[in-house]
Regions:
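Hydrophobic alpha-helical transmembrane segments of polytopic membrane proteins
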Residues: 187-224
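Short helix-to-coil transition segments within interhelical loops
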Residues: 125-128, 135-155, 195
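Transmembrane alpha-helical segments of polytopic membrane transport and secretion proteins
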Residues: 220-245
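Transmembrane alpha-helices
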Residues: 107, 111, 143-176, 204, ...
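Periplasmic/extracellular loop-to-transmembrane helix junction in inner-membrane transport proteins
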Residues: 11-52
Length: 245
């Protein structure tokens, strides 16, 4: 990639393809300023809020849909329909409804996360092994205990996979929304660089975004592969079941 980049700098002017040394210089200026941490934190807070609201709504709806068949038949097709609507449509509506700023970014991530997580969890529930539900009957678990001790631990692996998908798309959606709606956050800084025709700034902030993506994404993937949270959860819950019953 670097060799291709170097080659393209001989063909195109710096305003289109900036030189590597100018991008490195701009990147070092960002790293040495207080702007870096402040803007990264703003982007990460928006991403966390968007994921939180989307996942919370998904968990609530999943519990309701699995418990009430009529509501599932009425509203689940709507959830599937939401997945088809492109994020840019929601972004335009969010700007109209909420105005400019960080709120539209949070909204489109929440709406994009909601159908992905809900559909993944509902598909897993439909494929539940009946032996697990028989365990709930054996221990005479209540409905809430059945969710807590049986269904949630089983769904967690599906949740992890869906969460990785939501994260990988979410960080890009947040930056895109910031680019179009605000001058803060990583997307806002890219927008400022675009207005000032600082192509090296766009490249520099994009490099920072790539490192953030692989840093957080790699950590989440490691947690999923090792299964440390899942193992701890099963161990704790098995102890609680034995103590309770």
């Amino acid at each position: 990639i670097i060799l291709l980049w170097k080659f393209l700098t001989f063909i195109y002017p710096p305003v289109i393809i900036p030189k590597i040394d100018s991008v490195i210089k701009f990147l070092l200026n960002i790293l040495s300023s207080s702007l870096l941490i402040k803007e990264i934190i703003k982007t990460l807070i928006r991403m966390c809020l968007g994921l939180f609201f989307g996942i919370l709504a998904s968990i609530v709806c999943t519990i309701i849909f699995s418990k009430y068949k009529l509501l599932n038949e009425i509203f689940y097709p709507i959830v599937q329909f939401l997945q088809v609507i492109p994020p840019i449509t929601w972004l335009v509506l969010a700007i109209i409804w909420l105005g400019l700023g960080g709120k539209p970014a949070i909204m489109i991530l929440a709406i994009s996360t909601f159908p992905i997580m809900t559909i993944s969890l509902m598909n897993e529930i439909k494929n539940f092994n009946k032996n697990f539900l028989q365990v709930a009957q054996l221990f005479q678990l209540s409905s809430s205990e059945e969710w807590r001790y049986i269904k949630f631990p089983i769904l967690y692996q599906t949740f992890e996979t869906a969460f990785l998908v939501c994260f990988s798309t979410g960080i890009k959606l947040i930056v895109m929304a910031e680019l179009l709606t605000t001058n803060s956050g990583i997307g806002g800084q890219i927008s400022t660089a675009r207005i000032n025709i600082e192509t090296e700034g766009i490249f520099a902030w994009s490099i920072i975004l790539i490192f953030i993506y692989y840093g957080i994404g790699g950590t989440l993937l490691w947690i999923k592969r090792t299964g440390c949270i899942r193992k701890l959860w099963f161990h704790k819950l098995s102890e609680k079941v034995l103590i309770t019953k």
